[in-house]
């Protein structure tokens, strides 16, 4: 409504898990309230990402970002679904998520899940242009701040949108 996602549903048939959120009413997993993780920085975190298979021109800076983050976090996960990765952020299963070149239908539901679970979602510069750029960072505010400061050093100008 008016350009805002009001209701989100992400279903994982492999685990029979239904993630839901309604703006202003919180996020749930199979009826249980979700609150995202509480990591203070990147040390010991599990991060999720996807790879820009249609945006090969960004491969080098993106791999540089992954490499730099790899030295600061505990591990990476990749489900193959931005919506599910964001649902996992909302559930606290992973601490943060970042990816480039997404379409709104890839992340709109997951974005609301993260926000309703107490997290934030930004573009790669910490702004709110992710629906236009398709570049997204999500997690609790401290994790997002740490991700952004680490990523900025490696991003090409084309990704700073």
Q: Which functions belong to the PLM regions below?
A:
Residues 87-90, 111-116:
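Hydrophobic residues within well-ordered alpha-helices
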Residues 1-86, 133-161:
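Acidic beta-strand-loop-alpha-helix segment within the catalytic core
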Residues 105:
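Acidic donor-binding loop at a coil-to-helix junction in glycosyltransferase catalytic cores
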Residues 8, 110, 117-119:
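Small-residue (primarily alanine) positions within well-ordered alpha-helices
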Residues 91-96, 119-120:
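Alpha-to-beta junction loops
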Residues 99:
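Short beta-strand and adjacent tight-turn residues that come in two discontinuous sequence segments
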Residues 125-130:
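AMP-binding (ANL) adenylation modules
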